[in-house]
From Swiss-Prot:
GO terms for molecular function: ADP binding; ATP binding; phosphoglycerate kinase activity. It catalyses: (2R)-3-phosphoglycerate + ATP = (2R)-3-phospho-glyceroyl phosphate + ADP. Pfam families: PGK (PF00162). This is Phosphoglycerate kinase. Coiled coil: none annotated. It is an enzyme of class 2 (transferase). It comes from the Bacteria. It is found in: Cytoplasm. The gene is pgk. ATP binds at residues 201, 323, 353-356.
Length: 396
């Protein structure tokens, strides 16, 4: 798969329409987590140092094609200026004469932020006319929003086909990390898939069993796989209507030579609360009035052994009810093992998904992972083997 990067473009004096994801959490008009903004610094710095004029295109919230003042991007200007160390101008449109005038007035070293692309219904409809009006504002298109690449919108798909297009530094890093973990990985490859429900990760599981050597299943979905083997899981979270599907996934894994690792022992409790009385029992011995809330120490030891024998790790979803202690132990211990192996240069570790990032941060392991995707839905769709419109539009 080939795409151009900033290195392939002549940027001097050019207006570069740069699609970014600055859909950040805010309270009282202030940004509460600027992670997504900080991850754009390499691209913006590169554009400025090469004499380009960065013109930022972004969405915020779900205004559904109408102008919703509370979803204006203007309040983000101070956070952008702080992160980029450069003046950020703002214009209350993303097309038309006002936007064009603001682009033309941009001085070297300045950045322009256009208004929320979703204020126009044409954005989410991938409207060709809106894309043409956006294209009139720039010379080059740069997509640095992998997290929005699974949506075919005017600013991510149609626009990319109207101007010379390239990937920004964040997009480039994300694509390299994901290609390296799934398309051309160093083997053996292990995937950890956790979380509550099999039903939400069917496509993911189906794609992974054909591509990885070991699939570690944890969280609530492990209970469904245990139930599929005829094991009584008591009052545990379990999708009993999905046991047939779980059996099918196990059969497909066997046919593909993929080993599925399920918990051999589990931590059970009778109440779902922090510090609840709990005990560790074999996976097939959950009391009828108890629920499985975490993988046990023998299971974690088996997972750690698999990690140590692997060269590549893909992680999506926690191994237990990580939000409440002590049912965070399996997730924390396994994450710390992966971090240790990564630091030692023995493992390439890639993780993504909201709960996953929160769990790895809680374990103090996130910093050591080779790559952590902030992309959520786009990360999952890539892992499911789906074509992402925003990436396909950049392909050369």
């Amino acid at each position: 798969m080939g795409w151009k990067t900033l290195d392939d473009m002549d940027l001097q004096g050019k207006s570069v329409l740069t699609r970014v994801d600055i859909n950040v959490p805010m309270e009282d008009g202030k940004v509460t987590d600027d992670t997504r903004i900080r991850r754009l610094v390499p691209t913006i710095s590169d554009l400025l140092s090469k004499g380009a004029k960065p013109v930022l295109l972004a969405h915020f919230g779900r205004p559904k094609g109408k102008v919703v003042p509370e979803m204006s991007l203007q309040p983000l200007v101070p956070a952008l200026e702080a992160a980029f160390g450069a003046p950020v101008m703002f214009v209350a449109d993303c097309r038309g004469p006002a936007a064009k005038g603001a682009v033309d007035a941009l001085a070297p070293g300045q950045i322009l932020l256009l208004e929320n692309t979703r204020f126009y219904p044409g954005e989410e409809q991938n409207d060709a006319d809106l894309a043409k009006e956006m294209a009139a504002l720039g010379d080059i298109y740069c997509n640095d929003a992998f997290s929005a690449a699974h949506r075919a919108h005017a600013s991510t798909e149609a626009l990319a086909r109207l101007l010379p297009a390239c990937a920004g530094r964040l997009m480039e890093a994300e694509l390299k990390a994901l290609e390296g973990s799934l398309a051309t990985p160093e083997r053996p490859v292990t995937a950890v898939v956790g979380g509550a429900k099999v039903s939400t990760k069917l496509d993911l599981l189906g794609n992974l069993v054909a591509k990885v050597d070991t699939l570690v299943i944890g969280g609530g979905m492990a209970n469904t796989f245990l139930a599929a083997q005829g094991i009584d899981v008591g009052k545990s979270l379990c999708e009993h209507d999905m046991t047939g599907t779980a059996k099918d996934i196990m059969a497909r894994a066997e046919a593909a030579g993929c080993t599925i690792l399920l918990p051999s022992d589990v931590v059970v409790a009778r109440e779902f609360k922090a510090g609840a009385d709990n005990e560790t029992v074999p996976a097939d011995a959950c009391p009828a009035d108890a629920m499985i809330l975490d993988a046990g120490p023998a299971s974690v030891a088996a997972i750690s052994t698999v990690f140590a024998e692997s060269k590549t790790l893909i992680w999506n979803g926690p191994l237990g009810a990580f939000e409440i202690a002590p049912f965070d132990i399996a997730t924390n211990t396994a994450a710390q093992k992966a971090a240790e192996l990564t630091k030692a240069g023995q493992l390439i570790s890639v993780a993504g998904g909201g709960d996953t990032v929160a769990a790895l941060n809680q374990a103090g392991a996130a910093e050591a992972f080779s790559y952590i995707s902030t992309a959520g839905g786009a990360f999952l769709e890539w892992m499911e083997g789906k074509v992402l419109p925003g990436v396909a539009a950049l392909q050369t």
